[in-house]
Amino acid sequence: MTTLAGAVPRMMRPGPGQNYPRSGFPLEVSTPLGQGRVNQLGGVFINGRPLPNHIRHKIVEMAHHGIRPCVISRQLRVSHGCVSKILCRYQETGSIRPGAIGGSKPKQVTTPDVEKKIEEYKRENPGMFSWEIRDKLLKDAVCDRNTVPSVSSISRILRSKFGKGEEEEADLERKEAEESEKKAKHSIDGILSERASAPQSDEGSDIDSEPDLPLKRKQRRSRTTFTAEQLEELERAFERTHYPDIYTREELAQRAKLTEARVQVWFSNRRARWRKQAGANQLMAFNHLIPGGFPPTAMPTLPTYQLSETSYQPTSIPQAVSDPSSTVHRPQPLPPSTVHQSTIPSNADSSSAYCLPSTRHGFSSYTDSFVPPSGPSNPMNPTIGNGLSPQVMGLLTNHGGVPHQPQTDYALSPLTGGLEPTTTVSASCSQRLEHMKNVDSLPTSQPYCPPTYSTAGYSMDPVTGYQYGQYGQSKPWTF
């Protein structure tokens, strides 16, 4: 949709009755000054551009009439931080211009008593200068340094009360003001007192563009002390809702004999205290459940079956079982992330399982593959079986249904294929073969680690059996 320069589309012009989203990026609207956005209060702002001057004047006017900054923020749809910053800067410098540093302070409104005193001094001594009247006001303790009028203000009062007179008198007043300015620059009174007027510029003076409205000095309010009845009433209302509306706050203020503003501030402080207590309670509950990290029962883990090559010294090799039907393939527990399944013949005794390097098949977290020896008399290693959970114990002692493979069909296939025919024997496997030469009770004369494998060694028996996977028993794939 194309629009003319300076025109605001009617459909995207923010109206007072629209509800704008409270989260996410603000809406974008077209304004005469450029592409604007809508804040959370529904007001339009342009990022990087200062607030318009008429809104700044309105903020100061509302604050002059005693309206609180939070109410000004909601009515003008300007953020609370922007309102507070403008009011604070105006109170310090007397300027509402964006980025103003320094400038003149707001003009002091002279009280009628001070004006009468100035007229009295002038009548008693018609030749008294304005700066002399100012010093006499301070000397007689009519005003203090914060409330004493400036030299220009005294001159303006004298001109309005006694008339302009002749041109010479006006020139004398101007020279007098200039002389007082020069004196004030080098005196302590001039440094601590207010300056006469701001310098003129091409854009106009600061006084002409500023809203010449005195603001009440923000005084520290003493903390409100609530009685037991008031606290009980407020706590009951807080149990019903943490965010009462204006009607609930006014009704509660009448019952508790408080102002609506005090009730609103109390609920804000009470919500902050409630959030702090809720966070502390959650932290205490978390520490109570997990005093030293994770609890032992929360994450059951299997014992690690890792045996170092140097510490394992086979002293005896169990005999092979004569009945091949009773031979069981006992699966080794794998890491949770491992999905590969390995099939190792069980008639090869436990020492033969160490002849395959684990790095060849990707088991980097296991130094060696452990397969318990098969046999009815020694179903598992008792030293390792003591640390197993009942589920794993039942899995290892479950005999049946797994076909027997001859020793020559030595295959391990964690991926899609098995060992390659050109696979060489590892150094650790050769060392163990040297240690096992003195054993007389080997099941067969076939070596445990042949240098090469024939292609016939990869055939599988077409007998239907079961393989133990990660999620229980499943029928193997038939080739």
UniProtKB/Swiss-Prot annotation:
Organism: Mus musculus
Described purpose of this protein according to its UniProt entry: Transcription factor that may regulate cell proliferation, migration and apoptosis. Involved in neural development and myogenesis. Transcriptional activator of MITF, acting synergistically with SOX10.
Alphabetical keyword list: Developmental protein, Disease variant, DNA-binding, Homeobox, Myogenesis, Neurogenesis, Nucleus, Paired box, Phosphoprotein, Transcription, Transcription regulation
Protein name: Paired box protein Pax-3
Domain of life according to the entry: Eukaryota
Lineage, opening ranks: Eukaryota, Metazoa, Chordata, Craniata, Vertebrata
Record-listed Phosphoserine modification sites: 201, 205, 209
PANTHER family in the record: PAIRED BOX PROTEIN PAX-3 (PTHR45636:SF17), PAIRED BOX PROTEIN PAX-6-RELATED-RELATED (PTHR45636)
GO terms classed as biological process: cardiac muscle cell differentiation; cell migration; cell population proliferation; developmental pigmentation; heart development; mammary gland specification; muscle organ development; myoblast migration
UniProt DNA-binding residue ranges: 34-161, 219-278
Segments of this protein annotated with the region PAI subdomain: 37-93
Family statement: Belongs to the paired homeobox family.
Keyword Coiled coil: no
Positions of the UniProt region annotated as Disordered: 1-21, 165-228, 309-351
Localization per record: Nucleus
Molecular function as annotated in GO: chromatin binding; DNA-binding transcription factor activity; DNA-binding transcription factor activity, RNA polymerase II-specific; sequence-specific DNA binding; transcription coregulator binding
Record disease entry: The Splotch (Sp) mouse mutant displays defects in neural tube closure in the form of exencephaly and spina bifida. The splotch-delayed (Spd) phenotype is less severe than the other Sp alleles.
